[in-house]
């Protein structure tokens, strides 16, 4: 079995699932479209941290990440 580690080079593979769930929560809570929710998430400081492997935020689930996003706003 190969040692499978999350690195900066493969982190992009797990981000869409987390971000899409965050976007659904955001859209429902703020009454915006999914596209608008995605735009706000991708432009947030939370996402900038999430996309850096060394922040280790990728360990968090979408609910915890969403709560971090709300604290930022």
Residues of each region from the PLM?
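C-terminal alpha-helical interaction appendages
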Residues: 1-73
